[in-house]
Amino acid sequence: MKFSREKSQPIFDRAMNVMVKGVSSNFRFLGKNSTPVIAKGKGAHIWDADGNKFIDYRLGWGPIILGHADDRVSKEVSKYLENGTSFAATTELEVIVAEKIVAMVPGMEKLRFTNTGTEATMHALRTARGYTNKEKFIKFEGQYHGVHDYVMFSTASSPISAMGSKTSPIPVQVGSGIPNKIREYVYCLPFNDFNAVEKCLKDHHGEIAALLVEPCLGNIVGIEPQDGFLGHLRTLCDKYNVVLIFDEVKTGFRLSNGGARETYGVIPDISTYAKSLGNGIPVAAFGGKSEVMNVI
């Protein structure tokens, strides 16, 4: 089916003149003559600049868990906008939200707020390094943790042919501009491979600060952990003094109210949150055990 682009195309042509590929993320570019220009959204629907109506299955790549322009969210956000937006100081609203997260998420003791999922995973890794006085970390192939340099390896968009073998995986850099030396700090392993994780930690635990994992892979049609895999990670991290980080940017407040922690019954040392936390408002958080978080 072909839709009118009488209004959308001129807008996107202007975007191409002043924005790289006319978008704010490469994932949004669908071609010079087919990238949508959205005018509004309500509930599960969006409308483009020409008034064409669509069912929105992307929902902002995950954040819009309550639907676009939810009346309850819009009302509360509008109320707080009238009082100011950024004070560089503690507000009662922060405290209220933090208390709710601590109450909802099993094992959550203390947290910090930030703006994006990228920042949340970046802070979580830095906290783990500070707590353990070690520098390297493990991530899993196909998993996405944002766009800071340390996690831009072996994501779902990486060519499988470049990743090496199952027994000798190779971190595959995503995009350009990442210093070559950073690769030395990352171990990329196959997800759900019990033996690979155990061998890596046994051989390199003296230099590994953290194990960063999406409990359920969001960018690859929702691949779940095999029975016992997350518990296996917990046991190994305890044994080798490694901080277990759940990246719950996608799973948080979605798999269940308490996220993957509640759904799978495994408590990490730190979890990261964004997306569903704000229903499209840029807010994120990372938190976990007080002993670990207090090193910040």
What name fits each language-model region?
Residues 1-296:
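Conserved N-terminal phosphate-binding loop of PLP-dependent enzymes in the Aspartate aminotransferase
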